[in-house]
Amino acid sequence: MMNRWSALFKGDRVLWILIGLLMLSSLPLIYSSTGQLALRKYDGDTERSLLAHGFKLLLGGVIMLFAHRIPYLWLGRLSAWGVYIGCAILAVTLVYGQTINSASRSLVIPFTNISFQGSDPARFFLILWLARGLALLQKDERIRRFRDGWMHLLGGLMVTAVLIAPENLSTALMLLGVGIGMIWVAGARLVDLTKVVVGGLLVVFLLVTVAYLAGWPRARVWKNRMESYLSPTPGQEDFQVLQAKIAVSDGGLWGKGPGKSIQRNFLPHAYSDFIYAIVIEEYGIAGAAWVLLLYLGLFYRIRKIAMNARSPYGAYIASGMGMALMAQAVVNMLVSVSAMPVTGQTLPFISHGGSSILINALAMGVILSVSRDMTGEGDWSELDIEGESQTNKGGDAVPSKGEVSYA
């Protein structure tokens, strides 16, 4: 029986277990927190909300199984096309996207009722593209140089962020942070990175100020969220923040118990943006610590995979995907406990959602593919960064490092 499971779930088994625990932990939370959603979409049938969420988790699991069996080095040749596809999706979303909560973030697939956030696939494709570019720069020993080194990667990162920012500033800033983090991990000089970060912050501040003075609606939303965070008052703009604070303060050490949340009936988006507040209300500090430890464990395993990857490309993929997932989780938790302004970020594998679950599952599948190569369960040592056999090019195959233990 164990051999069957081992044959099905290859790579880092601890990573598989942690992802599974996050998914299982989400089920009672979604069932409890989707009352408002069920009233709007399912005539009050919360079981349908739970089944819909469970189906997305199951589909995410299938995607992980499929993705972790694909040699991650094959993704190198697809990454250039992928980043163009991601930017095209973002551009179409800006023009034809479905407006939700005063922001055009979702794109509806024609002839279906299925929608997805364009920033999710764009982020995935961009990280693959950055990882490939950084691996090639390291190979040519140009990662320490800016102008004839990683400047073009910064350009692609900025273009993607600019396309995301008008409707989702927090995601754009997080993506910029992940991209800069990947460049730093690859070995870029700290002085160059510091100049880029300082200059970027000044540009963002200038653009947001100009947008607000020009009367752009989204800029007003950003301003209102900052004001709500800095000086909350019992008004409509601060309703979410105040309700989340009540949920957190009522949780105590052990919480009210599963399904006994009161604030879920008043807190908008209790099943997505503020689900961590429901975790604290129902399961207390103990439940909040459990969820946090799962994410920390996930990040620790991904970090070990990145450090022991058998190619720079695999290391940068794992680093980028891991940073992106952890940043999303941390931001959601900080917002839920009123430690930062409202952003609209969901909690990976726990919040109710479609594209976020599926893209994060795909990202974890790719990381598991990297770990599968490390354990010797994927014999990809003869592939180069483009997924082509180096033996077929007339050279000797890359020597295998053997099985790597990272338990």
Model-derived features: positions:
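Membrane-helix boundary/helix-loop-helix interface segments in multi-pass membrane proteins
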Residues: 1-22, 28-167, 333-348, 352, ...
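Hydrophobic alpha-helical transmembrane segments
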Residues: 55-60, 282-299
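Hydrophobic alpha-helical segments of polytopic membrane proteins
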Residues: 80-81, 87, 146-164, 169-213
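Hydrophobic residues within the alpha-helical transmembrane core of Major Facilitator Superfamily
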Residues: 91, 180-181, 326, 364
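Alpha-helical transmembrane segments of multi-pass membrane proteins, especially transporters
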Residues: 120, 144, 148, 152, ...
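Interfacial segments of multi-pass membrane proteins
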Residues: 173, 178-192, 262-287, 344-358
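Loop-to-helix entry and N-terminal half of a specific, functionally important transmembrane alpha helix
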Residues: 305-344, 350
